[in-house]
Structure formats: structure tokens, C-alpha cells
Amino acid sequence: MSLNVVMGNGQHDLRSEMLTMIQQQFCQNELLTVFYIVPNHVKFDSEVNVLQRFSIMNGNDDSELYAQSRLQVYSLTRLAWALMKNTPDRQPDIVEPTGLFMIVSNILREQSDNLPVFSRMQTKSGFVSALVAQLVELRASNVTPENLLEVLEKSADNIFLRQTLNAKLHDLAIVADDFNARMGENQITGQETLIAFAKQLADLKLSNVAFYFDGFNGFTSAEMMVVNQLITTYPVTMGILGDPEKMGQQREGDVFFKPMTTVEQLSITARTAQQEVAITAATKMRPLSRTAQQVLGAWACLGEYRNFTGSRDEVHLNVFAAENPITEIKEVARRIRRSLVDDPTLHLRDIIILSRDLTPYQAHIEAVMSQFELPYFLDMDVNMMNHPLVELILNLLAPNKFQYQTMLAILKTGLLRPTFENKIVSHDEFFDIVSHMDNYLYAYRPYESRWRDFSRPFKLFQVTRDDDDTEISEDEKVNNRLEYLRHFIVEAFDELDDGFAMAKNLRQSVTHLVLWLQKYHVTDALLEQRDDFIAQGNLSRSQQSEEVWQMLTKTLDEMVEIDGERSVSLTDIVTTLQAGLSGAKFSGIPNNLDQLMISEAGIVQNTQYKQLYFIGGTRQNLPAQVKNAALINDAERSIVQPALQSGTNPRYLQNTAQQQMAEENLLFYGSLMSSIGSITLSYPILEPSGQLAEMSPFFKRLVDTFNSEVEVIGSIPSSAASLLKQYVGTARATLSDLVKILPVYGQTAAFKAVQNVISNTMQDRLERVLSAPNYQNNTTKLKPEFISALFGERLNVSISQLESYYSNPFAYFLQYGLKLQERATNELNVAQTGTLYHAVFENVLHELIVKNKSLRDITGDELRALVRQHMQSQLALPAFEILNDSGKMRATTNYLTRVCETLVLNLQAAARENTSKPEAVEQLFGFSKESLPPLSFARMQVRGKLDRFDKQDVNGEFGTIIDYKSNGKTFNWGQAYDGLQMQLLTYWDAAQQSAEKLGVAAIGGAFFAKISPEKTKITDKTDLNALFTGKLIPETFKYRGLFISEPAYVSALTTLEPQEKSAHYPVVLLKNGALGKIGVDAVDPDEFALLLQRNRENIITAGDLILSGYFPIMPVEGGLTYSPYLDIIRFDRALGDAYKVQSPADKNTIIKLLKGGQD
């Protein structure tokens, strides 16, 4: 028996050396079986390569099929399974992460009085998982807390560190002892599989076998135990990186320090077992290109900060710096496309893209590779926590399943679907109704009580049916399907919750969950998803459905086995499931045999690729900045590790961050080894964070050594010639770069040449894309047939619609022409509270009108009672049902009632200033026959509604219009002139033409009444003590608007003495008894006539423009502030869009304009 080590650098073909030795041994011993051990990650590729090369070595053609039973390729874990499969009764049970989490959680709960350190720490998120990981690491390293305490007692390191570690180890020892006792002899963690295998190897008697190890640079503690056991019993041969002439002289920081130290440790083991040790230098060379050979040779020196003395001739190390990560990955894809064209023998499977960290690229890889039509395999772990099944279960176990976000998360998994005729509803049909349910839930946000109140159906659409209707409308069908889905959800949730409530322990809870998933066809939906992915050719995604179900059931089984008889809460179940599934990963399966490999440098790769692209080589990423988050931190590890690693039985904890970073030079060397051909290094100049990035020092050493030119790749070609030379890829990818240089180089020959080639495959797309730079954000006039279809031949509009046209013409087209609307929402906002106040005021005043009373004629208490009465009647309506849904909303209702009382009392106070009396509320004009006539024009008529109409004096000489507003709106002369504020003037005009019907001779004024209280901010200059004690005096209510400056009307509004101002009306008398100007909303009758005429002209102009199809993108400044159409309008002043010029707000200036227009 012996330990044979074949040692060489990355230029040597260690595999060929060992296969030659195997061939010789086969000739010498016809009964010999060789177990060829490789790292697990490259097991399949290595098996194919080993057998192919061995076949050729034995004289077979490389195209012939070859089988060999005496040469078997395994990973260590597969070897353990192969050798131990015939002794299942001796194999310990493996406890999965879920079980470990439960065991440790139970220990912490039961031992809390004995764990002073851990009792404080376990309240921190993730502590239990960190403790589990630490216990697993100690067991896998064959180290106990007692071992660490012994080392600590002998240490002379930092006293404070020793004290803190001692306290931590004290608690860890208690937990570990209890943990080991509960695990017993027949249970192990997944990381201890190889340790168990190593122990059983001692009893295993194999004859005529030999073991070969290939591709390892070092071993974990568990792997080392297996290797040591094999060395003591069987012949072992190992191919490993290193320099045999420097054995024993290696130092930390050397590129080959780790593998050579590993050989040194194995040699001690072999000699202790009386085995021969032979370390030989490899002589066979890999078929490397000149570049790959010299780069490997250079890094062996440069990685140790030694000068490279080898030849630099004919080394073509490609290096480029890209503007950003997206440009970088696009450039790599472009170069790969070019390589495939230049070399017909090159396949995608011959190319690998590596990065130390793929995170900055992960979100862009799919889009870029699709654009360049490159099939690829992303060799990264995919976490099971993001799978729809896990998402479904965790949300089903959440306490508030009926909340909007949780409900949508459940429905959008597509796994919980109702059935129809014993079949689950199809995917498309289900998601169609889910989209409607989404709209309903978003609009109304129903509480759980509302979900369960089936007497109040879910209605997304309000449908009115005539008695003679025989067909159900589409809107009604949607409402019916919503109700069906609602009943299904409530029934399913209730059955789930009832089963959990009846369960007496964890076993019954888990059993109920699985049976519920089967009863409600979640398993069937999961199988349907799998089949759909198979049909799409996505084998990787299809297997995930099976893997996640297997992992879930395995996790649940583990939970029941360990703690099945204990009574647990749903919170405990969720926490345990999250712990068990958080580390679960899907096994990646390539969808194609020929595809590009994209992986990270920290993962073992095969060494047969013809091209290597190492991306993301910035100072920040390479060498990697490692952080250790283990329970025993790096400083504490540095105290105990030297003693653990010494002696004849060395043991190893996880390396510290510093030790891991010291191995980065070896990791980079292994990455360079993956290519036998070309090597391309790249990095982004700009990090995703926006910060400038520097080239990695690893890259820089190679670049400086070989004087490599660093090509700078911008996101935009610098010229047409540059496009032709550097940016040509697929037609689609090239087109995206072509359009970027169109404005400058569109007429050059190179540009035309590329354009002509693209036009052969995608002419329509080419024309559309190349026209993009000439795009102007302008609209064109609608065709007459479209105008007629959208607006009819004659307009029938409200004045607020015309105001919106002047504010933003294109938004008017979107809202009233195309009928585009935001998603409805039933949230309590300013608009909705304003509507509520408005409705209460209307009903209160209507009751007073019926009783022929005014606000002055009743007491404050009577008025409050009226407000409360009509508030209750409004709350019974569907529009305000949200205010009855919860205690919080009922408290809000009480607040709104008090506010409403205050506002009505404000109106009462103003009414006491004169003898006015409300005559009508919600007075319509331009609607039904009972309403007042509309304002009619040649091609349109204007309709509207007067919130309140008062008879201002007892003789009925004057009438006053009141319009309720949530904000403190005032009359703006400039906006009235521009058509932006036409409401008061139009209402005045409509009321004046129907003055006789309204019972007055003329309209004297129109005012805005603010019906929302002003909010006081803490930042406002105010008395904070009064604010916090509720004694802050509220603002004084005041009407603002416009009135005729006739003395009779002014006297009807208020009775004032000279130098006095009205408390509630915009009226001030000067010393001489005349009307003042500041704070007075008066207008001369002649000037008012001009203003009214301008208003009519604005109405006619707006109607003519609308019916001519003129909807320019020319909003007034502020017209886009609350617009829901910003994403459609795309207004951008930097790109030439302009606001409409507004007139000044000054009254005198506008009057001059009005008189000038008249002249």
C-alpha cells in the first residue's frame, strides 16, 4: 500500500499522468478496480472526459462507444453511497435542517435558565439558524466545545477575547451536549455523511482496488477523514497542484500553499500508517495555447508577488473595460457570436463565462443572451423559498390571509384554484378572474368580516337589469365569477383554519395541511405547472415542481418525527418551515447539450473549455471581500485554530475571512486553468451603485506583465466604422447599437452597409427603430370618423370637463374620448371625505328647505342632530361602507362626524350675518326635464349642478350660488380669462337664464365654500401648547368668489359700518363707506358682462377644438401635477415639450385685456 502524489502546475496534464498509471496497473492486475474520485460539481463532465480519454489511450476511435466497469468515476458522496448501499441497516438517519432547527429550538427553550449568553442572543433574528450552523460545523469538524475550552485555557491571547469566547463556549457546550444526546448514535447531520462513511471504511474489506483523486486542492475535515482512512488501507494516488521541489518550503500566501500543505498532512498520515509515500513531478503537458500556457506560468509567480521571467512573446491576453456591467456582458456576448462565426468547430459548450460575483449581472443575463440568441446555463443556486408552492403555504399559514397583499400572493401562485366539473379551472381562465378580483380588492380593501358577509356580494361592476332582459351581460358574469371565487376562498380558508384549530399536536397539524393541499387540488395544479414547463422545453423549471414537493414533504416528515406529539402554534410551524426551506436549493439541469456555461469563480469547473471570459474584475470583487457571519467569529477562531490543526490528528474549523481571502490567488489560478485556449478579462468602469470602479489588482498584474492593451468599450459606438468593427452581433443586437449613432453617422457608408444587412431579416423593425430619434411628442388631429365615434356630432359636457381641456388637452382626450381610468380605489382620501361632507350638507339643507327654514332658524344642538342623522344614512350606502368595516374606521367615522358638525355650524354662523335662505340644493341644469335648461350653443350644450342656491334677500331680488370645495379655492381672474376656471361664471350664466324659475330677479354673486378643515402642521408657527391640548382656535370660515358691486346686493350679504369687514364674506368697507379693494371679491356690472362674454367664448372655443380633433400635448404649468396619464403623455421640457402660457392673475390686467378685446 502506498500514497502516490503526482504534482504539477496548471500546465501539466495530471489526469493523463494518472490514466497512464491506471492503464499500466490494469495490465499488471486484471482483477483491479479503480475508483476515480473527482469533485462533486464536475462529476458528470469528468466521468465523460475520463472514459473518453481512457478509450483513446487504449486504441479506440474517439467516435466509438466505450464502456469500462473497472474504471469507475465517483464523487466522494457518490462513492459513500456506492460502497455502503448494501448495508442499509448500518446507515444512520440524516436529520435535515428543519429537524436540527426544531431540536435546537427545544433545547434553548428548556435550558434557558442555564444559558446566560444565548438567552439574550436568541431574541435576535437568525440566531437559532446561526447556532444550528455552528453546531453542525463542530460535529463535521469532529470538534467539541470542550476541545475549544481546553485550547482556550492554554492560550495566552487577548484576555477580553478569551473571556467573551469562554462565556460563549460555556453555553455552546451545554447546548452541544444536549444536542448530541438527542441525536444519539443513529442520527447525523447531512455534513457528517462522510464522517460516518470514514468510520465504516475501517470495517469494509475491499480487494483489488485502488483510489485516484483528481481535481482537489484541499479537503474539508469530513473529506480528510475519508481520505486518511483510505490511505491507511488502500493504495491511493492523487493528482494535485504544486511544486514537488518546494515541498516543505511553502509559505502562506503562496499560490499552491493549500494543496501542498494538504499533501504534507496526507504524507504524515501515510507514514504513520507505515505506508510508502512517493511524490513525483508531472511530465505530461496539457494541450494549451501559447496564451493560456504563459498566463498560468505568470500567475504562479505574480500571485506570490514574484516577478515573471518567462517569455512574453505571442501572448494574446484580451482585456477590455466596459462602461457598465450591461455593456460588459453585451460585449462578451458579441465576442462569443463572432468567435462562433470565425471558428465553425467551436461550440457554445466550449466557452465559459466566470465572475467572482455574478450578482451585478444576474438581472441582465437573460435579456442579453436572448438578444444575442445564445443558449446558456446559469450555474448558480436557485433558492426554493421563492417557489410558488412555498409562497402559497407560508401565506396560507399567515395570520392575516384576507389582507390585500397576502390574498394576492396566494392567488397569483396559481396553485389554489376552484374546480368545475371535477377539474381545476384552467390557468388562463383562473388568472382572468384573479385580475378582476385584484381590481376589486384594490378598490375596496375588504376586511375579513366583509369577506364573510355573503349578504353583501362583491360587485366590481354596477349592473342594472330590465325585467325583460334574458341574457346576462359580461359585467354581470364577472360579478358572478367574483362571488364564486370568493365563496371558494372563504370555504378553503375556513376548512384549513378549522383543521388547525382541532389539531392537538404537530402531527395532526401537518397531516391536516397535506390532506388539505390534496383536497383542494394544489398537488394537481403543481403537476400541471410541471407539464406546462416540459411542453415549453424548460426542463430545469419543470423539475423544480417535483423537487419542491419532495423537499416540502421531507421537511414535514422531519418535523413530525422530531416533535410530532408537541402542541405547537402556526407561528412555530412557519418559523420551522422557513428554517428548513431557506437553505434548500434546486438542482440545475441544462436545457441543451450545447450551451454556454456561466458560473462563479468559487465553483469548481472542468479544465477543457476553449475560451474563458472572466468578467467583473474590479478591485471590489477580485479578490473577494469575504465576511464570516458564524457564531464563533474570526477573532475567536484565530485563538483556537492553530492548536486544533497541530498534532497527528488535525481538525479544521471553517477558515477565517482572512484565510479565505489568502486563497483567492489559488482560486483565480483555478479559473485561468479552465481554458486551454483564449482568455479574456474584463471589468465595468462604473459599478451598479454609480461609483467608479478600478481594475482588480489580479488583472492589473497580468496586464502590466504582458503589456496588454485595455480596450475601452462604450455603451454607444464612437463612429459608424467602430460599429462595423466592434458592435456587430445578431441583427437585433446590432440594431440597438445602430440607432444610437443615427443622428451623427446615419449617412455614412458603414452605417448604410449595416443597415442593409439588417433589412434582410427585420425590415419592419428596422424602419420603426430608425424612426425613433426623429420622434416628436406631438399629436395629430383626429379624423372626422374618429371624432364622431368618440364624441358624437354634438357635445353634451360639464363645465369641469371643459376646464380640464384647457388645463391639459391631451389628458381630456384620454379621459373623455378613450375613457381611460385609473384603477378604482375605495381608500378614504380627501376627495372621498369631501364627497361625504357634500352629501351630508345637501341632505341637511334639503330638510330645512322642505320645512321652509334656514340655518338661522334652528339651534346648534338641532343642527348637530341633523348632521348625525344624515351621516348615518350616508354610511349605509355602498360608497362609504369602508367606514363600517373595522373599529379603526368607526373611530374615523366619529371624527368625520365631529368635523362635519363643525363645518355646518360654520355655515350657520355665516347665515346669521344676513337674511339669506337656501332655496335649492343639487340644482341640475341641462339634465332631465325636471332640471333647469342647459346653456346651449351651436354645436354643444353645457350641463351642471349648483351645490346650493340661496335667495339672498326676503324680496327675492338677488340670488346667490354656493359651490362646495375641499380646498380653499378663490376666484382667479387670469385662470377665468384662460378658461381654466369657468365654473362660477358658467353656473352664474345658467342660473341667470333661469332666474325666474329660481324665484329671483337676478344673480348677485357666486361663492366657493370650503368644506374641509385646515390641517395644522407642527412645523407651522403656532401655539404648540394650544395645539396639543386641543385649544387651538380654528380658522374662521369665509366665502370666497365673485359678486356684483351693487349696493343693494352688498347690503343683502352683510350689514357693515365704515372701516368694518365681514366675518364670513369677502366684503370690506372703507372709511367713506365705499367697498375696499383688498380682500374684496367685487366686480363692476359692466366689467362682469365682459367677463361673462369671455367665458362664453371660452366654452365655444373649447367645443370647436374638441370637435375638430385638436388635442395637443400642451398642458398649463401644474396641469400634470395630479395627472394619472403621465406615463402616456411623456411630457419632457428637455425634449422640446412646452407648457401653455398663462395670463397674469391680476384683476386690473385682465380687465384691460377684456376691454381691449372689446375695442
From Swiss-Prot:
Lineage, highest ranks first: Bacteria, Bacillati, Bacillota, Bacilli, Lactobacillales
Enzyme superclass (EC): hydrolase
> What protein is this chain from?
ATP-dependent helicase/deoxyribonuclease subunit B
Gene Ontology molecular functions: 5'-3' exonuclease activity; ATP binding; double-stranded DNA binding; helicase activity; hydrolase activity, acting on acid anhydrides
Keyword line: ATP-binding, DNA damage, DNA repair, DNA-binding, Exonuclease, Helicase, Hydrolase, Nuclease, Nucleotide-binding
Give any extra note attached to this record. Despite having helicase-like domains, this subunit does not have helicase activity.
GO annotation (BP), single: double-strand break repair via homologous recombination
Q: Does this UniProt record's set of keywords contain Cytoplasm?
A: no
Gene expressing this chain: rexB
